[in-house]
Amino acid sequence: MNKIITLFTIFITANLSAQNFQLHRDFERDHFTTTFEFFKPDKYGNTFTFIDFDYNAKSGISQGYYEIARVLKTEKMPIGLHVEYNGGLGTFEANGAQGGYTINDAWIFGLNYAKGNANWGFSTYAGYKAIKNSGKANYQVTGTWYLNLFKDKLTFNGFADLWSENGLSERTVFLAEPQLWYNLNKSFSLGGEVEISSNFAGFTGSYFRPTLAIKWNI
């Protein structure tokens, strides 16, 4: 689970905040990833943030990625205003030396629509994406969903992103991460995800990368 550009997973909760910690084993890339997610609604909308760490360096963490999003929406507004920031950094090894890199800062400004209840829900937004050092205007469209089955014993959730990186006529990126969880109880779940991507993170073409994971609902 290597979310380099974006992730936006909102669980529609009436009056409660929610946070969870996930530990994933990525079989293709042969490393662990941890994810911490936090979601909190209020009378003016909701705030979502998460941070990913990849453990692919000999000494520990090889990459960190951070995202925070705010939806401004009251009960009288059918559509919310979406503001989001993405960014991160990482390390790599080459010829016995260690180097570093940054993931270009990105801001997204758009409109959000969400609908759901205790059993199912979805959220979607579309907006203008300003990527640092990109010479052209970009866009991003995101959809997230959740579905609770068999009296909440099974949860199917995830997201799908589509965005441009250098204007409308050049590189278009797709990333989706559907997750399936078996809920042992209210605190712990076992499951995993499949990262489905096209032209993502410097790779050309399509990839399918499965993980096995455990989730702790805090």
Region locations from a protein language model:
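Bacterial Sec-dependent N-terminal signal peptides
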Residues: 1-20
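Short glycine/proline- and aromatic-enriched beta-strand/turn motifs that initiate or cap beta-hairpins
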Residues: 18-57
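Transmembrane beta-barrel strands of outer-membrane/channel proteins
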Residues: 23-25, 49-53, 83-87, 124-128, ...
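Residues that define the transmembrane beta-barrel architecture of outer-membrane proteins
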Residues: 30-34, 62-66, 101-107, 135-141, ...
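Residues on the lipid-exposed face of transmembrane beta-strands in outer-membrane beta-barrel proteins
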Residues: 36-40, 68-72, 107-115, 126-128, ...
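Repeated loop/turn-to-beta-strand initiation elements of outer-membrane beta-barrel proteins
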Residues: 44-49, 74-81, 116-123, 147-156, ...
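Hydrophobic/aromatic-rich structural module bridging two neighboring secondary-structure elements via a short loop
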Residues: 60-110
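Outer-membrane beta-barrel transmembrane domain signature
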Residues: 127-189, 193-200, 206, 216-218
